Amino acid sequence: MKLHLLDGTYELFRMFYGAPPSQNDAGLEVGATRAILRSFAMLLEREDVTHVGVAFDHVIESFRNELFDGYKTGAGIDEALWAQFPLAEQAAAALGLVVWPMVEFEADDALAAATARFADEVDQVVIASPDKDLCQCVRGERVVLWDRRRDIVLDEPAVIEKHGVPPAAIPDLLALIGDSADGIPGIPRWGAKSTAQVLTRYGAIEQIPDDEGAWDIKVRGAKTLAQNLAAQREDAMLYKRLATLRTDVPLPQTSLADLEWRGADREALEALCATLGETSLLERVRFAD
């Protein structure tokens, strides 16, 4: 049995910028929502998709914005995209999916929490997202990332091959090299290659010596790297905290059975399809009744 966890925020962004725009009868832009509805419906046609949860950033800001002023916000998001977040959540719910609309936490936190809670109860957890933050959740072949657009699966060896560090060190990697998508600046001069080398040896930021003379590996520019980290170690630890996904999100589902997909909600889906001007989908979806 597999548990599929969907990154609704990523999917909505992908559809908004990748699918044709479309307006409903009221003149509202709904193209991304129509696309995500079709995409999720297609996913549910797969025989191995039996238990599913989808997380959305109901608001972009989270507890991380209270920790660091430079962390990502909703500023600059296209209004036509932002207006479709509630519709996309409705679409997922109408399909009968468990939906986690995050406010205090982020969508990625919900996916990490669900993974931690249910990974040992299934054969595999498939996190449908290419987001590098989520690589920290990968565990052997039990928990994998699946980029649906490119149909690429990352298990633990693949994460190491791609990023140079094991999943557990992904927050350390992002803290040091930075993550522009999340507003994490990183530590000056710490590039991806040198950071991977250092973390491969020491495992975590906390274990990296301040004094370059104490390093027992050869890394280009080691003196500068050590000096910069020593000067900004407190910042680095904050960035690591920002990059570390929370697994203590209070998800209401306590049993794997709560995530079983039993079919779409006929009344809700018919109403939503009428709003979106989407009619052909109703012929393809299995309903709970």
Task: Mark where each language-model region is.
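Extended two-metal-dependent nuclease catalytic cores across DNA- and RNA-processing enzymes
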Residues: 22-23, 74-250
